[in-house]
From Swiss-Prot:
UDP-N-acetyl-alpha-D-glucosamine binds at residues 13-14, 21, 227, 232, 288, 310, 318. Homodimer. It comes from the Bacteria. Catalyzes the transfer of a N-acetyl-glucosamine moiety to 1D-myo-inositol 3-phosphate to produce 1D-myo-inositol 2-acetamido-2-deoxy-glucopyranoside 3-phosphate in the mycothiol biosynthesis pathway. Mg(2+) binds at residues 297-298, 300, 324. Keywords: Glycosyltransferase, Magnesium, Metal-binding, Transferase. This is D-inositol 3-phosphate glycosyltransferase. One of its GO terms (biological process) is mycothiol biosynthetic process. It comes from Paenarthrobacter aurescens (strain TC1). Gene3D superfamilies: Glycogen Phosphorylase B. The gene is mshA. Belongs to the glycosyltransferase group 1 family. MshA subfamily. 1D-myo-inositol 3-phosphate binds at residues 7, 18-23, 76, 109, 133, 153.
C-alpha cells in the first residue's frame, strides 16, 4: 500500500503545528496493517534540512520524506502549488523500489487526495481516501471573523469523492456528511472507527499520576490536550472555567493545557485566560509523547473537548482508555466516541455557562465521576487499531477487485 500524508508527517509530534489526530491515525493504522501482513509505504513532504530520505517507525512500515519545495514547514494553503512536483517525486521513488508497484493508494486529507487521483491514473491502481476533515462541514461552524475554507479545497474534495474507488469514513455521521454535502455514493463508503493504543493508554492510580505530573492531590484538575486554535474550542473551556470559579470559589481548581498554536496567529489564548481570571490556576505546556500524555490523562478529573468540528476525536478515546471521563461538544465523531451520561457528558453548543454546568455537576458528584471513569476505560477497549485495520483492509480489497481508477 502507498499511503499519502503530504501535508503532515506521521513522525511529527501530535498537538504541534498541523500535527494532530490524523498523524496518530496514519501511523497507527499503518502499523496495524503491517501486523496483518500488509506492507505500507507512507509518502510525506520533507520539511527540515538533514531529514533522512526514509524513516522506519516499525516493521513493515517506512516513511518516504519527499523533496518538493523548500525544506521547511509551509502553510497548507501553499501546498497545492507543489502537488505536481510531489507526484513526480513519488513516482521517481516508486521506480527505485524493488517491487516497483503498489496494489492501491490510501490518501489522507484533501491535498493528498488530489495527488492520489493523479497517481492512481498514472499507476493504474485504485485510490482509497479518508477525508479526516471536510471544507463544507468546517465552513458551517465558522465563528465571526474566521476565514472560510477556500473554494479550491471544496472543489478538490468534490473531485476526490467523484474519483476515488472507495471512501473510508470515521463514523456513520461522517459518511452521511459525504453523501449530503458531496453527493457520495453510500455503497462506496466504508466506516472504520479509529482506534486507540490500549498498551499505552491504560487506567492507573490517579494519585500516583498526579504525583508524577506535579498536580495537587485534592484539586479539581481539568485537562485540555490538542492544537491551540479556535476550531478546537479551548477558549470555550477557559470561559466556562472562569464562570465556574466565580460561581464556586470553594473549588480548588487546577487546569492544564497541552498543545501549541496552530493556524491563525491572531488567536491569543492567554488573553482569554487572563480575561477569565484564571492566570494563577492554568499551566500551559507543549505537546508531549503518548506515554506522558497518558499519564496526564490519568492525573485529570475530567478531560474537555469543546471542538466546533471533529471527524472523530482521538483525544476523547485516549482519555477514556485511561479511565478519565470526557466533557465534549455533541458534534461529529465525538457523539460516537463518548457514551453520553455513561463515560462522559456531551454538551449541545458552545455556551460557556452550559459547559460550566457540566463541569460543576462532575465536581459535585464524585461517585458519578468515578463510575464514568470505570465505564470509560471499558468503553475504549472496543476501539483497538486492529479492528480499524481489518475494516480498512476489506475496503482495499473491494477497491482492488473493482479496479476503479479516477473517473473523468
Amino acid at each position: 500500500m502507498a499511503f499519502l500524508s503530504l501535508h503532515t508527517s506521521p513522525m511529527e509530534q501530535p498537538g504541534a503545528g498541523d500535527a494532530g489526530g490524523m498523524n496518530v491515525y496514519v501511523r497507527a493504522l499503518a502499523m496495524a496493517l503491517a501486523e496483518s501482513g500488509v506492507e505500507v509505504e507512507i509518502f510525506t513532504r520533507s520539511t527540515k534540512a538533514g531529514q533522512p530520505a526514509v524513516e522506519h517507525p516499525g516493521p513493515g512500515v517506512c516513511v518516504h520524506n519527499v523533496m518538493a519545495g523548500p525544506r521547511r514547514k509551509l502553510p497548507k494553503e501553499e501546498l497545492p502549488e507543489l502537488l505536481h512536483h510531489m507526484v513526480e517525486e513519488i513516482d521517481r521513488i516508486r521506480l527505485q523500489q524493488l517491487h516497483g508497484r503498489y496494489d492501491a493508494i490510501h490518501s489522507h486529507y484533501w491535498v493528498s487526495g488530489v495527488a492520489g487521483l493523479e497517481l492512481s491514473e498514472l499507476w493504474g491502481v485504485p485510490l482509497v481516501h479518508t477525508m479526516h476533515t471536510m471544507a463544507k462541514v468546517k465552513n458551517l461552524v465558522l465563528e465571526s471573523g474566521e476565514r472560510p475554507e477556500p473554494r479550491r479545497r471544496e472543489e478538490g474534495e468534490q473531485r476526490i469523492v467523484d474519483g476515488a474507488a472507495r471512501l473510508v469514513a470515521n463514523t456513520p455521521a461522517e459518511a452521511d456528511e459525504l453523501v449530503s454535502h458531496y453527493g457520495a455514493d453510500l455503497d462506496r463508503i466504508d466506516v472504520a472507527p479509529p482506534g486507540v493504543d490500549l498498551k499505552v493508554f491504560t487506567p492507573s492510580f490517579r494519585r500516583k499520576s498526579r504525583s508524577l505530573r506535579g498536580v495537587r492531590p485534592d484539586s479539581f484538575h481539568i485537562l485540555f490536550a490538542g492544537r491551540i486554535q479556535r476550531l478546537k474550542g479551548p477558549q470555550v473551556f477557559v470561559k466556562a472555567a472562569g464562570i465556574l470559579r466565580k460561581r464556586r470559589p470553594d473549588i480548588d481548581l487546577e487546569m492544564t493545557i497541552l498543545g501549541s498554536l496552530s493556524g491563525a496567529k491572531d488567536f491569543n489564548l492567554q488573553h482569554f485566560i487572563e480575561d477569565a481570571g484564571l492566570a494563577d490556576v492554568v499551566t500551559h505546556r507543549p505537546p508531549v509523547v503518548a506515554p506522558e500524555l497518558a499519564s496526564w490523562f490519568r492525573s485529570a478529573d475530567v478531560v474537555v473537548m469543546p471542538s466546533f468540528s471533529e471527524s472523530f476525536g482521538l483525544v476523547a478515546l485516549e482519555a477514556q482508555a485511561c479511565g478519565t471521563p470526557v466533557v465534549a461538544t455533541n458534534v461529529g465523531g465525538l457523539s460516537r466516541a463518548i457514551s453520553d451520561g455513561r463515560t462522559g457528558i456531551l454538551v449541545d453548543g458552545h455556551h460557556p455557562s452550559d459547559w460550566a454546568d457540566a463541569l460543576e455537576d462532575l465536581y459535585d458528584d464524585v461517585q458519578t465521576r468515578e463510575d464514568m471513569g470505570r465505564l470509560a476505560a471499558t468503553h475504549a477497549e472496543s476501539f483497538g487499531w486492529q479492528r480499524t485495520a481489518a475494516i480498512t483492509l476489506e475496503s482495499y480489497r473491494e477497491a482492488v477487485s473493482g479496479l476503479l481508477v479516477p473517473r473523468r
